[in-house]
């Protein structure tokens, strides 16, 4: 069975098709990236760390579902830190953890496939979620975000769901629920529910004007940016 290095990060979930730049400065994870480069290991598993958790106890401090990511690029800095870019693939279960031989953790590859159902039902569910997302964007994003959303929106339904989940402003624990959803339809419906709740809770006086405002996200593409344990700055889908 294949093994992947495990990278626990606070405030960070990775969905299929999502790209994520990471700054690696902690010694054990610098070693992890060096080993990946030396051994031509192009995949790592990223999992959400629980709030205020002791990362040294990885089984208690992380969620049981994470994501396998491909390392797209690695850039080493003169001080030995790294900038890397990863791309979300399939989700996985965090099972047996191994740290006997390395300063970082590794896990066995245990895929956790997302259930797929009737394509027509999935398509209709995606349309509904996208309509709600457009409403959500009008309330919470800058005035020109809708155009950028339409330009960046993927065609594949799985990636459309990832695009929505990565862009809505929700706590990491709720985003984790989206990642763990049993099926694509469940993921889309729960994302729609979260967006609808936030739209309905929004005060009318807080609605953005027709002009750009510093209080709103500048573009849809950075709406889910977050800073994680290694100063990770989350970007969205290609």
Map each language-model feature to its residues.
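N-terminal low-complexity, acidic/polar interaction/targeting segments
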Residues: 1-238
């Amino acid at each position: 069975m294949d093994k992947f290095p495990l990278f626990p990060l606070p405030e960070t979930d990775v969905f299929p098709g999502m790209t994520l730049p990471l700054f690696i400065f902690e010694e054990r994870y610098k070693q992890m990236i060096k080993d990946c480069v030396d051994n031509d290991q192009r995949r790592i598993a990223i999992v959400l760390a629980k709030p205020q958790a002791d990362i040294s106890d990885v089984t208690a401090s992380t969620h049981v579902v994470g994501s396998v990511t491909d390392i797209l690029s690695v850039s080493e800095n003169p001080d030995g830190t790294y900038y890397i870019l990863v791309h979300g693939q399939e989700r996985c279960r965090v099972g047996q953890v191994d740290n006997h031989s390395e300063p970082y953790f590794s896990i066995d590859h245990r895929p956790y496939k997302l259930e797929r159902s009737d394509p027509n039902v999935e398509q209709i569910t995606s349309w509904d979620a996208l309509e709600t997302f457009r409403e959500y964007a009008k309330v919470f994003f800058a005035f020109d975000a809708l155009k950028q959303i339409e330009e960046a929106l993927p065609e594949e339904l799985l990636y459309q769901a990832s695009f929505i989940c990565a862009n809505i402003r929700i706590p990491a624990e709720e985003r984790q629920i989206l990642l763990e959803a049993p099926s694509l339809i469940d993921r889309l419906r729960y994302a729609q529910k979260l967006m609808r709740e936030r739209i309905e809770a929004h005060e009318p006086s807080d609605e953005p004007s027709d002009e750009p405002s510093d209080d709103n996200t500048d573009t849809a593409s950075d709406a889910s940016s977050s800073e994680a344990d290694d100063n990770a700055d989350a970007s969205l889908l290609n």
